Amino acid sequence: MLWALFFLVTTIHAELCHPDAENAFKVRLSIRAALGDKAYVWDTDQEYLFRAMVAFSMRKVPNREATEISHVLLCNITQRVSFWFVVTDPSNNYTLPAAEVQSAIRKNRNRINSAFFLDDHTLEFLKIPSTLAPPMEPSVPVWIIVFGVIFCIVTVAIALLVLSGIRQRRRNNKGPPGVEDAEDKCENIITIENGIPCDPLDMKGGHINDGFLTEDERLTPL
């Protein structure tokens, strides 16, 4: 009796799961290429884990919460680690629509890959497009980064304006360079008229150049 029941179940599974069957998906793994010397052997334990991950993904779909590991069937398993699988309905002997299975796999693709230490290129669902990895969120909000950059620019601009004002004020306080030195040099210049040295006229003190005094003016007492 048990042998007959086992044979019946096997026959039903063979009818539901076979290459290119309705709602069936092919999976291909490249364990050696992904892990190198740390590659593991694909055995019945790995098959059980795969079925568990598919059942887990299906239980996330509305109205598919009753999906169990036994509802995930594998067939045509090869040594190069490729196989086909289908997901059967819990109450009836038919496979679930491919669209539901595909949606469930896509939503949990990262979880399935992580379970086998693989990625979308080394664990391939041939009829299911690869999903993009979620974008990395920066640890610091973007608006804080933008605010910090603007604040630094404004601070540098204010500092440059203050330094420029201080330099300009110092230049104004000193006045034009060389003016006082030129005046001093002009006062000390001694001119020569007709071979007679003449002192410049001191306009400030009313000094008279002796070179232009007559003999009477020089001898006339004050």
Swiss-Prot record:
Glycosylated residues (UniProt): 76, 93
InterPro entries, A to Z: Collectrin, Collectrin_dom
Residue positions where Phosphothreonine is found in the record: 214, 220
Membrane topology: Single-pass type I membrane protein
Signal peptide: 1-14
GO cellular component, one term: brush border membrane
Annotated site residue numbers, Cleavage by BACE2: 125-126
Residues in compartment: Extracellular: 15-141
Topological domain spans for side Cytoplasmic: 163-222
Principal subcellular localisation of the protein: membrane
Keywords: Cell membrane, Glycoprotein, Membrane, Phosphoprotein, Signal, Transmembrane, Transmembrane helix
Membrane-spanning ranges: 142-162
Disrupted-gene phenotype: Deficient mice are viable and fertile but exhibit a severe defect in renal amino acid uptake due to down-regulation of apical amino acid transporters in the kidney. Greater urine output, more dilute urine, a defect in urinary concentration, higher osmolar clearance and an increase in free water absorption, suggesting an osmotic diuresis. Decreased urine osmolytes sodium and urea, presence of tyrosine and glutamine crystals in the urine, and increased excretion of amino acids in the urine, suggesting an aminoaciduria.
Residues covered by the Collectrin-like domain: 21-222
Changes after translation: Glycosylated. Glycosylation is required for plasma membrane localization and for its cleavage by BACE2. Proteolytically processed in pancreatic beta cells by BACE2 leading to the generation and extracellular release of soluble CLTRN, and a corresponding cell-associated C-terminal fragment which is later cleaved by gamma-secretase. This shedding process inactivates CLTRN. Three cleavage sites have been identified for BACE2, two clustered sites after Phe-116 and Leu-118 and a more membrane proximal site at Phe-125; the preferred BACE2 cleavage site seems to be between Phe-125 and Leu-126, Phe-116 and Leu-118 act as alternative sites.
Induction remarks: Up-regulated by high glucose concentration in beta-cells (at protein level).
Tissues and organs where the protein is expressed, per its UniProt entry: Expressed on the apical surface of the proximal tubules in the renal cortex (at protein level). Kidney; collecting ducts and proximal tubule. Pancreas; beta cells of islets. Expressed in the cerebral cortex, hippocampus, brainstem and cerebellum.
Biological processes annotated in GO: calcium-ion regulated exocytosis; insulin secretion involved in cellular response to glucose stimulus; positive regulation of amino acid transport; positive regulation of L-proline import across plasma membrane; SNARE complex assembly
Localization per record: Cell membrane
GO molecular function, a single term: protein homodimerization activity
Subunit structure as annotated in this protein's UniProt entry: Monomer. Homodimer. Homodimer; dimerization prevents CLTRN cleavage by BACE2. Interacts with SNAPIN. Interacts with SLC6A18; this interaction regulates the trafficking of SLC6A18 to the cell membrane and its amino acid transporter activity. Interacts with SLC6A19; this interaction regulates the trafficking of SLC6A19 to the cell membrane and its amino acid transporter activity. Interacts with SLC6A20B.
Domain comment (free text): The cleavage site containing the double Phe-Phe motif acts as negative regulator of shedding by BACE2.
Function according to Swiss-Prot or TrEMBL: Plays an important role in amino acid transport by acting as binding partner of amino acid transporters SLC6A18 and SLC6A19, regulating their trafficking on the cell surface and their activity. May also play a role in trafficking of amino acid transporters SLC3A1 and SLC7A9 to the renal cortical cell membrane. Regulator of SNARE complex function. Stimulator of beta cell replication.
Family listed: Belongs to the CLTRN family.
PANTHER family: COLLECTRIN
Name of this chain's protein: Collectrin
